[in-house]
């Protein structure tokens, strides 16, 4: 929504005042919250900052973890460009099955499936790092587009070697990888590797540019280098 496009949040918040206020805050900033669910069975999660700035999560369990597959309206993807999700809510509770339903619905309607692991942020929501890493890796092949950061490399692959790590991800549906480091931005397909100096290009702006190409998930592997450069520059 901040990039001038249409964005909708599919999730569940607590029915307490904080959850309602959060929904109103997002809606006021252009996010479509008409499909947000609310529950009285759990509260909206809260993140505090510790003395050293570390995230302290209150989630016991929280509202979004109880967001069940039957609450998701698959028809919402009929006119969607993409489904985007992170690792924060992939725990083995109803919400993981809801993600799988959303992925299937997006694919059925021809929408891109985009996965941004966001390991550094997601770690605060998981009980331990091994299960987070294993689950994140299970979801990689489900995506058409992967949106990765430098901070994802070591937690995911135990290595900072970029090409070794990223090219191993081209399995099943994965056709395009956007990778942002402190000094460069990279774009990988199965046949092309491009890079440019870090220019502040965000994953959201990258997806907006991808949308402007009017392409489809099954056409990604055939995009020529000159077309791919339009996504970076």
What do the predicted segments below correspond to?
Residues 76-78, 137-140, 171:
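A short, aliphatic-rich alpha-helical micro-motif
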Residues 106-112, 171-176:
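A short helix->loop->beta-strand "cap" motif at the edges of active sites that frequently abuts
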Residues 191-233:
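Conserved post-catalytic alpha-helical subdomain immediately downstream of the catalytic base
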Residues 96-102, 127-135, 159-166:
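Charged helix-capping and loop-helix junction motifs
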Residues 145-155, 164-198, 230:
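Conserved phosphate-donor
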Residues 6-87:
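Conserved N-terminal subdomain of the carbohydrate kinase-like
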Residues 118-125:
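A short, histidine- and acid-enriched strand-loop-helix "catalytic/donor-clamping" loop
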Residues 27-34, 129-155:
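Structural recognition of alpha->loop->beta junctions
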